[in-house]
Amino acid sequence: MNSLQKIAMVIDADNTQISKIEAVIREISKHGRIVVKRAYGNWKKDTLKNWEGEIKRLAIKAEQQFDYVSGKNATDMALVIDTIELLYANIYDAFVIVSSDSDYTPLAIKLHESGVYVMGVGERKTPEAFRTRCDEFIFLQNLSPEGRSSAAKK
């Protein structure tokens, strides 16, 4: 892969470990310049309280998404809508989706069909359908604190 000029990275905080985010950013930065770093979640939830310090330190834009119905979050939908808006801006040559959620498979397909490079980052449990629709998928378990990884490439 050639060096990418402008990378947009979107993070599903509900399905990602904050302890790995710095290593993810370091790894993705090897491919090019990350110009968008956004994390989506309901930051009012106790489960995401530990993200605040890292979000500030790593200059990630936190996108608040409230849960409109008990037991159901809207984070996935907000992330997808924003990503499609970024795609139609026509200024990014790569998108990184950080999540282990198979719900992002249609998004990866749309991005891929639009001709941009698609990278996924998630746990080994990430469904194959999502992993294979990415041009490259990086397993969180393979990222060390120093940012070295073993990526699965197509």
Annotate each language-model stretch with its function.
Residues A13, D67, S100, V116, ...:
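Short, ordered loop/turn segments at secondary-structure junctions
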Residues M1-Y88, I109-K110, Y117:
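Domain-level signal for Mg2+-assisted phosphodiester chemistry and nucleotide/NA-binding surfaces
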Residues Y40, D93-S100, L107, L111, ...:
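Acidic beta-strand-to-loop metal/phosphate-binding motif
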Residues N15-Q17, W43-D46, S102-Y104, K125-T126, ...:
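Conserved nucleotide-binding/hydrolysis micro-motifs of P-loop NTPases
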Residues I7, D93, D135:
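Conserved acidic residues
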Residues A108-L140:
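VWA/integrin I-like adhesion module and closely mimicked acidic/polar interface patches used
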Residues E146-K154:
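N-terminal regulatory modules in eukaryotic regulatory proteins
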Residues K72, K125-A129, P145-G147:
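Short gly/pro/ser/thr-enriched loop/turn and capping motifs at secondary-structure boundaries
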